[in-house]
């Protein structure tokens, strides 16, 4: 029985070793073993580029509600741009037809999926999110030591956001979505100061010309306002009444200005209604003037109407008297 167990164990170990060796060979086998793969030496670089691109896509998708890709995915973006730089400088690695791998990846074919995906990640995600307004990346591709720094206004916003959230957590014992968070409750009163400071700072930056926040800050602030006003009902009725009163004052002012405008126009006109001339009822013009103004009369016709014995001379063009 001991021999049987030994054989079974030995066979199991042998099978496991064969499977492991096969998987290891598949993972480490050079792509150039395929004689039909013209670009075999470049394939491993494309595979690694695909990995960093997919990691950036996954991070952006995971942090898309709300979109906070700038503050959550900056390291993935750096990794992606770093290896993109490396693939564009593969000048010492060649395909089987002696083209550099950089040419193979980016210039060798009618379509370059690597280029299209890289452009989409850069322009459609990073740049459209205005990440440069919140984050500054000091690129150092040759040394692979790029550094990240957050802008001062972004840090100030995050600090105020943390202060407000800490206030909410402290008074709710960690249960942020507490049933008692209704209008007039303690949390709305105790954390109103920190919320007003947060919103005041955001609004100051938002209304400053030529100064932008990244999308991360804008969407985070919008969600915070909805949470405070609509979910927790912390918006004061006095604030809402003040807004309604302001709208009514504006509307009343517009009506008053319109009435004054028409009153001033009536007074300047002497209080009389304007008389409109109906040209359709006027009689047709008569006499010699109508004949002179007739569009069908030429200079030659005018001369022919003068009697032969008349002493009146007309300056008629030569080409019309011949």
Curated annotation (Swiss-Prot):
Entry function: Modulates the transport of substances from the endosomal to lysosomal compartments. Plays a role in lysosome formation and function in coelomocytes.
Signal peptide range in chain numbering: 1-20
Glycan attachment points: 62, 98, 144, 170, 180, 183, 222
Entry keyword set: Glycoprotein, Membrane, Signal, Transmembrane, Transmembrane helix
Source taxonomy: Eukaryota, Metazoa, Ecdysozoa, Nematoda, Chromadorea
Cross-referenced PANTHER family: OSTEOPETROSIS ASSOCIATED TRANSMEMBRANE PROTEIN 1, OSTEOPETROSIS-ASSOCIATED TRANSMEMBRANE PROTEIN 1
Compartment(s) where it occurs, according to its Swiss-Prot or TrEMBL record: Membrane
Protein name: Coelomocyte uptake defective protein 15
Entry membrane topology: Single-pass membrane protein
Transmembrane intervals: 244-264
This protein's GO CC annotations: cytosol; membrane
Family: Belongs to the OSTM1 family.
An annotated GO BP: lysosome organization
InterPro entries: Osteopetrosis-assoc_TM_1 (IPR019172)
Gene that encodes the chain: cup-15
Outcome of gene disruption: RNAi-mediated knockdown results in the accumulation of substances in coelomocytes within the body wall cavity, which may be indicative of lysosomal defects.
């Amino acid at each position: 029985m001991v021999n049987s167990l030994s054989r079974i164990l030995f066979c199991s170990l042998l099978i496991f070793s064969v499977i492991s060796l096969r998987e290891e060979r598949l993972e480490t086998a050079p792509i150039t073993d395929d004689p039909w793969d013209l670009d075999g030496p470049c394939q491993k670089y494309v595979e690694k580029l695909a990995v960093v691109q997919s990691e950036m896509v996954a991070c952006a998708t995971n942090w898309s509600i709300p979109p906070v890709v700038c503050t959550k995915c900056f390291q993935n973006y750096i990794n992606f741009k770093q290896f993109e730089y490396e693939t564009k400088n593969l000048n010492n690695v060649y395909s089987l037809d002696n083209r550099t791998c950089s040419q193979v990846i980016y210039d060798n074919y009618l379509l370059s999926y690597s280029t299209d995906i890289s452009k989409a990640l850069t322009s459609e995600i990073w740049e459209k999110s205005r990440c440069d307004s919140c984050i500054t990346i000091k690129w150092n591709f040759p040394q692979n030591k790029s550094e990240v720094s957050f802008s001062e206004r972004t840090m100030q916003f995050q600090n105020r956001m943390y202060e407000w959230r800490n206030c909410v957590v402290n008074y709710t014992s960690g249960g942020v979505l507490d049933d008692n968070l209704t209008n007039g409750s303690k949390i709305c009163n105790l954390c109103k100061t920190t919320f007003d400071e947060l919103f005041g700072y955001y609004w100051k930056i938002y209304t400053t010309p030529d100064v932008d926040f990244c999308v991360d800050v804008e969407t985070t602030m919008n969600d915070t306002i909805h949470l405070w006003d609509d979910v927790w009902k912390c918006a004061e009725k006095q604030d809402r009444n003040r807004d309604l009163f302001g709208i009514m004052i504006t509307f009343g002012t517009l009506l008053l200005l319109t009435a004054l405008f028409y009153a001033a126009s009536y007074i300047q006109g002497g209080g009389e209604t304007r008389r409109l001339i109906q040209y359709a009822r006027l009689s047709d013009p008569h006499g010699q003037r109508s004949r002179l103004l007739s569009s069908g009369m030429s200079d030659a016709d005018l001369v022919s109407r003068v009697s032969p014995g008349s002493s009146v001379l007309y300056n008629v063009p030569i080409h019309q008297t011949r």
